[in-house]
């Protein structure tokens, strides 16, 4: 029996404040709007193109 694939859980990337939807993570500057960057302890990284921004 094959293992089940983990879902993307995109609902965790948004929150509602004052009746408006607010994005929690940044978009990738290379891929454009719609592709979120992953928030790590020391960096922001894009899983699609591999772009990385280091935190200071």
From Swiss-Prot:
It comes from the Archaea. It holds the Pfam family Ribosomal_S27. Keywords: Metal-binding, Ribonucleoprotein, Ribosomal protein, Zinc, Zinc-finger. A zinc finger (C4-type) spans 28-49. InterPro entries: Ribosomal_eS31, Ribosomal_eS31_arc, Ribosomal_eS31_euk-type_sf, Ribosomal_zn-bd. Binds 1 zinc ion per subunit. Its cofactor is Zn(2+). Belongs to the eukaryotic ribosomal protein eS31 family. Part of the 30S ribosomal subunit. This is Small ribosomal subunit protein eS31. The gene is rps27ae.
């Amino acid at each position: 029996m094959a293992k089940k694939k983990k879902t993307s859980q995109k609902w965790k990337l948004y929150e509602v404040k004052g009746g408006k939807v607010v994005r929690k993570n940044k978009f990738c500057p290379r891929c454009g709007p719609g592709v979120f960057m992953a928030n790590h302890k020391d960096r922001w990284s894009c899983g699609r193109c591999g772009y990385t921004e280091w935190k200071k």
